[in-house]
Amino acid sequence: PSRARLDNRDAANAPPVDISVNHAVTITVQDSIELFRVAETNDGTYAPLGDISTLNRPLRIGFAPDSISGTRVSPETTAALEDVAQLCRDLGHEVIDFKVPLDGKEFTDKFLLYWAAGAAEFAQQASAYSGKPIGPDIVEPWTLGLAAMFQARQSEMEDTIAYLKAFEAVYDDWFSDMDVLLTPVTGSPAVPIGEQAPDGDFDAVMESVLNFAAFTAPMNVAGAASMSVPLSWSSGGLPIGSMFSAKRGEDGLLFELAMQLEMTRPWIARTPPVSAL
């Protein structure tokens, strides 16, 4: 959901740039809509979501299958996104190729430093709670590595925060000639359990994380409306999400599109080989 669209009782303690997301993963679009309505804020920042019906007009959708930072995207993910783009065309939407106008390496570098600051704060809290110095006895290698990254570049934090705060306006400019942006959610289908375990080799985990989580960060930083829709399936029988994003506040538009997509390609009867449903 758009930043501050849903009730956040801890808003007074929010960090300088709130990159967290307050919502849930639901089985149906209607479930997501109902939860959204219950949790909406009523402070006047946004109009109430109101009634949502299936989209009945064509949209201009930007198609951006490549990672902004140049990390690899699996062929299976790319093929799934191309199929979803064609689905959108079949529904009457105009799909245009879109090159994200962003220095992806700079953005990723700033985002990682900001993320590392959170790990450093957690490590300090763990040390204070345990009475032990920060080290492998109290935190895992992943947290230690991120904390060390922050300590080495702490002097850059002021500029990093300013850059990330300014990004919201940069993001909104992307939509001057389109309604919605279509990208992968992740760089590959779900990775094996343990590949990104925090007790693994730091460099190996970082490489896996950067390749996998290569698309969501801009939307988190911008506080944008964004959704993952499970329209595709991997060769291993796992869902592959497609991410549709819009300007902040355009949550209703995304819900309308989601309802149209769900009616056209329903997923409720499909489950992975191992499922709790």
Identify the function of each model-found stretch.
Residues L55-A64, Y114-D172, P184, S188, ...:
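Short helix-loop capping/hinge segments that flank enzyme active sites or metal/cofactor-binding pockets
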Residues L238-K247, F255:
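Short, well-ordered beta-strand elements
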Residues G70, P189-A190:
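Short glycine-rich, flexible loops that bind phosphorylated cofactors or substrates
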Residues V191-A213:
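Short, surface-exposed loop/helix-turn segments at secondary-structure junctions
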Residues M219-V221:
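Short hydrophobic alpha-helices that are characteristic scaffold elements of the AMP-binding
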Residues V73-V100, A123-P133, M157, I161-M178:
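Acyltransferase
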Residues P1-V84, Q125, R265-L277:
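A short helix-breaking turn/cap at a secondary-structure junction
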